């Protein structure tokens, strides 16, 4: 149990896919304009990570090494399709807001990296925990970034107005330049605090 808790801690903090490993930048920058988008993208990726890690771990001895990447992408694509269809059916506004970035989870570096580096070499339960840990780390990073960008760029959080009618939002924060600026500042602060804790 302690091993799994350590895995969770590492996935969220010391080995965070976005804030430490710097992978998955495309959806990170594109979908963090609002907290709802950040949560939606993070949870969708987490579900795909958990399921794909489990299946890849189960099939690791049967997948020939020469076609392993193609096999991983096929497995991941199946779960992404399921998540996309569920979002379209039950959360159509979120699905529309995230647009093309849900199908692009198929080639997300985080998911492919965990399939190759962890799930293909470990048993099912540790692979599921790894998927959960990395997914929560991804969601955590997206929530921080999207909260900052939405508050400064719109004056809202999860669509709820914070400052009233007179607030002049910093429109740049919801544009790509604001995404890069916020990401750089958050990474710097996060890594500085990690080094203090060591």
Question: What are these model-predicted stretches?
Answer:
Residues 7-10, 14, 57-61, 126-134:
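Short amphipathic alpha-helical coupling elements at transmembrane boundaries
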Residues 6, 128-198:
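C-terminal transmembrane helix-loop-helix hairpin of multi-pass membrane proteins
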Residues 25-29, 45-50, 77-84, 106-112, ...:
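Hydrophobic core segments of alpha-helical transmembrane domains in multi-pass membrane transport
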Residues 63-76, 97-103, 127-130:
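Cytoplasmic-side transmembrane-helix entry/capping segments in multi-pass membrane proteins
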Residues 52-65, 112-122, 189-196:
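C-terminal ends of transmembrane helices
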Residues 82-97:
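Transmembrane alpha-helix boundary signature
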Residues 35-51, 71, 95-106:
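Structural signature of hydrophobic alpha-helical transmembrane segments
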Residues 12-31, 42-43, 182:
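The first (N-terminal) embedded transmembrane alpha-helix
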């Amino acid at each position: 149990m302690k091993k799994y808790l350590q895995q969770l801690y590492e996935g969220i903090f010391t080995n965070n896919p976005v804030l430490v490993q710097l992978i998955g930048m495309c959806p990170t920058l594109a979908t963090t304009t609002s907290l709802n988008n950040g949560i939606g993208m993070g949870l969708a990726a987490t579900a795909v990570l958990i399921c794909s890690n489990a299946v890849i771990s189960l099939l690791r001895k049967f997948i020939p090494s020469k076609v392993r990447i193609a096999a991983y992408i096929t497995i991941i694509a199946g779960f992404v399709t399921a998540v996309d269809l569920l979002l379209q059916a039950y959360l159509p506004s979120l699905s529309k807001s995230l647009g093309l970035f849900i199908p692009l989870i198929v080639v997300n570096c985080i998911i492919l990296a965990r399939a190759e580096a962890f799930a293909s070499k470990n048993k099912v339960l540790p692979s599921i925990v790894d998927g959960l840990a990395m997914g929560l780390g991804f969601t955590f990073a997206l929530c921080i970034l999207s909260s900052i960008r939405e508050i400064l760029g719109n004056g809202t959080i999860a669509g709820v107005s914070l400052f009233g009618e007179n607030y002049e939002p910093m429109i740049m924060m919801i544009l790509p330049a604001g995404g890069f600026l916020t990401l750089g500042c958050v990474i710097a602060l996060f890594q500085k605090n990690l080094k203090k804790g060591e």
